[in-house]
Curated annotation (Swiss-Prot):
Primary site of residence: cytoplasm
Subcellular location as annotated: Cytoplasm
Motif placement: 'KMSKS' region: 253-257
Organism: Geobacillus stearothermophilus
Protein name: Glutamate--tRNA ligase
Length: 489
C-alpha cells in the first residue's frame, strides 16, 4: 500500500456497543492488523443530549473484551488527539471560518418552521426528495450583518457545487456515482455551534491521517457530502468500504427495537459467551474466507483477511450459529476458565452460595466439567444442571416411557443393591456396579443404561452417567431408585 494504513472506528457514547458497531470495528481492526497498520477509536460525543452515562467507557471496554486492542483513543494517546469530538470544537471552527472566507459556506437564518414549510411545498409539487432552496445563499454581506445584529440564530451551510458528479471507488461495491443536483446546500454547523457529522468526520479523518474507512452501508449516501468538503480543502479522501446491512432471520434490517435478538455485546458477555467466539463470529458476518472452515483464531483471521472477499449481500445474524460456534470454543476451553465463566451463574441463580467451602467448590467444578460438551454459553449451566439441585426427581415423558418397560424393575433393583454397598461412591465404582448389573440381568445397551438414567435424573439424555450419579450423591441416588421402583409408570 502506498501510504501507512490508519483506520478509524468512531462510536457515539449514546449507548453501548451494538453488534453492528462491533462488526464494523472488527473489520477495521482486521484490515489494519493485516497490513501492519494502526486502528484509532474516536469518540463522536457531540450529540450531548443523547449521551448516556458510562457510554464511552462501555464502548471501549467491550471493544477490548472482544480482543480489538486499538492503538489510539482517549485512553491511548498517539499524537493525533484530542480523540473526543467535543474537545475538537476549536479545530472545526478554524476550518468552518476558512470555508466562510472562501465563499464555500454561508450563514442560514431560516427557522425550522420555514424549512418545514419549504419541504411541504416541494412535496406538494411532486418532489419526492425535498432539498433546501438556497434562499440564504443569496443574502448580501449587509443583510447577514443586520440579521446577526438582531441576534437571529443561524446554521452554517455548505454551498453544493453545481453540475458535478462525485464518484466513489468503493472497496465493496465498486464504482458508485452521485450527482450534486440531488443534494441541497447542507448544514455543516448547527444553530448551537456544534458541527454536523458529515463535516466533522472529514476534518477528523484528514487530521488523523485515516487512509481507509470501513463503515455501514447506511453511510454511503453521506459520502458525496464528505467528498465536497475534501474537494474544497484540496485534501485526498480515504478509500471507502461500505459494509452490507446486518439482517435478522426474516431477512429484515436489524432494528435495535427487535427484542427477538440480543443486540449488545455486553449482554453476550453477561450470558457467558466467549470473546474469541464472538470475534470469530463477527468476522464471518459479511466476509467469507476461502474453503469451508469456520473456526479461526484471531491471528488466523488477521493473516487471511482479504477485502476482496467482503460480501455485497446482506449478512444474516444467525443466533443459532453463534451459539453453535460458542459451544465449539467451550468444548476446547481450559477447565479453570470454564469454571470462571459458568460458576458465577450458578451463584447468581441461588444454586450455590457465594462463600463456598473447598468441598462445594470442587463439586461445582466437577459439575461444570460434566457439562463442558453440552454447554453453549456460561449461563446455560443453570438449566442444564437443574436436576442436581432438585429434592424430587421430575420425570420427562420419554423417561416415563422407558421406566414402564418390563425389564426395568430387575435392572433398578439390582443396581440399587450395588449402590447401597458402594464405598467409595466414585464414577469408577459406579461403572463397575453397572457392569455387574449387566451380568446379573442379561440386559445391555439402552435396555440397561436408559432405566438407570431415567430413574436417577428423570431424563433420557444427559451427561456421562457414572459421573452424574457420583455428583448426585449416594443418598439422593438411593432415594430416586427406590421411588422409581415404587411408582407406577
Amino acid at each position: 500500500m502506498a501510504k501507512d494504513v490508519r483506520v478509524g472506528y468512531a462510536p457515539s457514547p449514546t449507548g453501548h456497543l451494538h453488534i453492528g458497531g462491533a462488526r464494523t470495528a472488527l473489520f477495521n481492526y482486521l484490515f489494519a492488523r493485516h497490513h501492519g497498520g494502526k486502528m484509532i477509536v474516536r469518540i463522536e460525543d457531540t450529540d450531548i443530549e443523547r449521551n448516556v452515562e458510562g457510554g464511552e467507557q462501555s464502548q471501549l471496554e467491550n471493544l477490548q473484551w472482544l480482543g480489538i486492542d486499538y492503538d489510539e483513543s482517549v485512553d491511548k494517546d498517539g499524537g493525533y488527539g484530542p480523540y473526543r469530538q467535543t474537545e475538537r470544537l476549536d479545530i472545526y471552527r478554524k476550518y468552518v471560518d476558512e470555508l466562510l472566507e472562501q465563499g464555500h459556506a454561508y450563514k442560514c437564518f431560516c427557522t425550522p418552521e420555514e424549512l418545514e414549510r419549504e419541504r411541504e411545498e416541494q412535496r406538494a409539487a411532486g418532489i419526492a426528495a425535498p432539498q433546501y432552496s438556497g434562499k440564504c445563499r443569496r443574502l448580501t454581506p449587509e443583510q447577514v450583518a443586520e440579521l446577526e445584529a438582531q441576534g437571529k440564530p443561524y446554521t452554517i451551510r455548505l454551498k453544493v457545487p453545481e453540475g458535478k458528479t462525485y464518484e466513489v471507488d468503493d472497496l465493496v461495491r465498486g464504482k458508485v456515482t452521485f450527482e450534486s443536483k440531488d443534494i441541497g446546500d447542507w448544514v455543516i454547523v448547527k444553530a448551537n455551534g456544534i458541527p454536523t457529522y458529515n463535516f466533522a468526520v472529514v476534518i477528523d479523518d484528514h487530521l488523523m491521517e485515516i487512509s481507509h474507512v470501513f463503515r455501514g452501508e447506511e453511510h454511503l449516501s453521506n459520502t458525496p457530502k464528505q467528498l465536497m468538503v475534501y474537494e474544497y480543502f484540496g485534501w485526498e479522501p480515504p478509500q471507502f468500504a461500505h459494509l452490507t446491512l446486518i439482517v435478522n432471520e426474516q431477512r429484515k434490517k436489524l432494528s435495535k427495537r427487535d427484542e427477538s435478538i440480543i443486540q449488545f455485546v455486553s449482554q453476550y458477555k453477561e450470558l457467558g459467551y466467549l470473546p474469541e467466539a464472538m470475534f470469530n463470529f463477527f468476522a464471518l458476518l459479511g466476509w467469507s474466507p476461502e474453503g469451508e472452515e469456520e473456526i479461526f483464531s484471531k491471528d488466523e483471521l488477521i493473516r487471511i483477511f482479504d477485502v476482496s472477499r467482503l460480501s455485497k449481500s446482506p449478512s444474516m445474524f444467525d443466533t443459532k450459529k453463534l451459539t453453535w460456534m460458542n459451544n465449539q470454543y467451550i468444548k476446547k476451553l481450559d477447565l479453570d476458565r470454564l469454571v470462571e465463566l459458568a460458576l458465577p451463574h450458578l451463584v447468581k441463580a441461588g444454586r450455590l452460595p457465594a462463600d463456598m467451602s473447598d468441598e462445594q467448590r470442587q463439586w461445582a467444578r466437577d459439575l461444570i466439567a460434566l457439562y463442558q460438551e453440552q454447554m453453549s454459553y456460561g449461563a446455560e449451566i443453570v438449566p442444564l444442571s437443574e436436576l442436581f439441585f432438585k429434592e424430587e426427581v421430575e420425570y420427562e415423558d420419554e423417561a416415563r416411557q422407558v421406566l414402564a418397560e418390563e425389564q426395568v424393575p430387575d435392572v433398578l433393583s439390582a443396581f440399587l443393591a450395588h449402590v447401597r454397598d458402594l464405598d467409595p461412591f466414585t464414577a469408577d465404582e459406579i461403572k463397575a456396579a453397572i457392569k455387574a448389573v449387566q451380568k446379573a440381568t442379561g440386559q445391555k445397551g439402552k435396555k440397561l443404561f436408559m432405566p438407570i438414567r431415567a430413574a436417577v435424573t428423570g431424563q433420557t439424555h444427559g451427561p456421562e452417567l457414572p459421573f452424574a450419579i457420583q455428583l448426585l450423591g449416594k443418598q439422593k441416588v438411593i432415594e430416586r431408585l427406590e421411588r422409581a421402583l415404587q411408582e407406577k409408570f
